[in-house]
Structures are given as C-alpha cells and as structure tokens.
Amino acid sequence: MKFKFIKSLLGTFLINVCFSIFAHAKTPEFEEIYCEIKVNKKKLALFSLYVADTYEKRKYGLMNREYIKSNSGMLFMWKDLEKRIFWMKNTYFDLDLFFLGKEGQVLEIFKNAKAFDENQIFSKQKVMFVLELKAGVHQIKIGDKLNCAYLNL
C-alpha cells in the first residue's frame, strides 16, 4: 500500500515536471531581414524574411505559425554547401521552397509543399540557403538571384 502511494506520488511529480518544462519551451527569437529577388538586375519582389541560422532555428522554422504574409518568409542558412532535407510538420500553410547556391542564385524549386505533410523534401543539389515563401504567390524561377545586404549577396 505504501509502495503504491509513493509510486503514484512520484508519477504525479514527474508528469508535473514534464508539463513545466514544455510550458516554458518557447519559440526561438528570429531576426528579421529584408531581401529582394532580382531577374536580370531588375527587382522582382521585396521580402521580409526571418533568419534561421542556427540548428534550433532551422529545426523550428515556420512551425506553429498560423499565418504568413505574402511578402514574408524564412531564409534558412548554413555555412557549407550540402544537400538539404525539409518537411512541413506543424506548418499551417502551403509553401514554395527555393534552394539557393552560395551566391544566392535559385538552383531548384519545390512548389506547393502541403501544410502538415511529414514527407521529406530533398534538394537534388548541394545548397547553402533555402527560402520558404507562401505557395503560389511569387513568380521566382531557376536562375533568379536573392539580393540581400545582410548576406553580402
């Protein structure tokens, strides 16, 4: 009887600790920058982008946001060229993914990634940046270039 009480008390304590930890887990702080896409040196569009430049920020991405403006998105950054893998877990809206080389040029496009889809999206080439924007809103093409003072591009 005494053992059951202690076991129950310990279980309740552990559950409360877990809830406390998860309740204090918060969204990483994302820096916001402004970048433009250029085609033949002419500005195509200006974007407000959240920067995901750490493991924690890249892991969180646009998850759990219920809305994104048509001129907003997220720019994922790495210091090396590698093939990248994405998914749409806990993402509330469809996205277009633009895979960019080290000079900011669009190398690949994955259109209309579906909200909440946990299937993996792979880049075919090694890339340094991935730009996520609201699906179907922009006419960005392979070869277009991201111009961003923040990145010296």
Label each region the model flagged:
Residues 2-10:
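Bacterial N-terminal signal peptides that target proteins for export
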Residues 9-20:
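Bacterial N-terminal signal peptides
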Residues 26-153:
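Compact, glycine-rich, soluble single-domain proteins
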